[in-house]
Design a protein with these regions (language model features):
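A short, small-residue-rich loop immediately preceding and capping a beta-strand
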Residues: 1, 85-100, 118
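Active-site-proximal loop->helix
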Residues: 1-38, 125-134
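A glycine- and small-aliphatic-rich helix-loop capping segment at beta-alpha/alpha-beta transitions
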Residues: 14-15, 105-116
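Buried hydrophobic positions in well-ordered alpha/beta secondary-structure cores of metabolic enzymes
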Residues: 16, 75, 90-92, 97, ...
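Active-site/ligand-binding loops adjacent to catalytic centers
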Residues: 31-34, 38-59, 63, 83, ...
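A glycine-rich, Thr/Ser-enriched phosphate-binding loop motif common to dinucleotide/cofactor-binding enzymes
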Residues: 60-74
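Phosphate/pyrophosphate-binding loops at sites that engage ATP/ADP/AMP, CoA/4′-phosphopantetheine
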Residues: 77-85
Length: 190
């Protein structure tokens, strides 16, 4: 886990350690942690690699999106129970994209449900980035013009400071199946 993220999400660390997790801190954020995890996994045959977001190489984004789809199933069930119909719109925040992928997964074939993902403006890969390849995925990312270096930013939300986004969201953007926009920290606090 990135040292920056460790400092910001201490409660998650406490829970993970309670369940026996061993934590390896690496300098940086989620980006550096994923890169380090992939390097460690590919050089140690006894290790397994599991990613908790819809980022990284296939099949990990699909596995996580499927697991997170329980969110969309709950949205469907509760909407029908409380409103008598499925929702007209689903709006959610997008960092790497796992929570929002889970929220909309159940509704991808429902054209009547408008889907809006909102990124932190400071790290908005879908709205401000360009296509690139890193960490085993082709997706939109914040990077230098020549693609040689990834760029990042900081936001108040620890989970939305990733320099890129899962490839599912890139595909949905390109297919115009989901609308993506961004909001600044100040706008989010209003």
């Amino acid at each position: 886990m990135g040292e920056v993220d460790i400092a910001r999400v201490n409660q998650n660390i406490i829970k993970a350690k309670h369940y026996g997790a061993k934590l390896k801190a690496v300098p940086g954020t989620l980006k550096e942690a994923i890169t380090d995890a992939i390097k460690t996994w590919t050089t140690n045959p006894d290790y397994a690699y599991i990613c908790g977001s819809v980022v990284s190489a296939n099949p990990f984004p699909k596995i996580v999106a499927f697991a997170q789809s329980i969110i969309g199933k709950e949205i469907r069930e509760q909407s029908i129970e409380q409103e008598g119909k499925i929702p007209n719109m689903i709006v959610g925040c997008v960092g790497g994209g796992s929570n929002f992928a889970g929220a909309i997964y159940e509704f991808l074939d429902e054209a009547s449900v408008k889907k809006i993902g909102v990124e932190a403006h400071e790290t908005a890969a879908l709205t401000n980035g360009t296509p690139g390849i890193m960490q085993g995925m082709k997706t939109y990312m914040l990077q230098t013009e020549d693609g040689a270096k990834s760029l990042g930013g900081m936001s108040l939300g620890a989970g939305i400071t990733y320099f890129s986004v899962g490839p599912l969201h890139s595909y949905l953007k390109d297919q115009k199946a989901v609308t993506y926009s961004s909001a600044t920290d100040a706008e989010m606090l209003e």
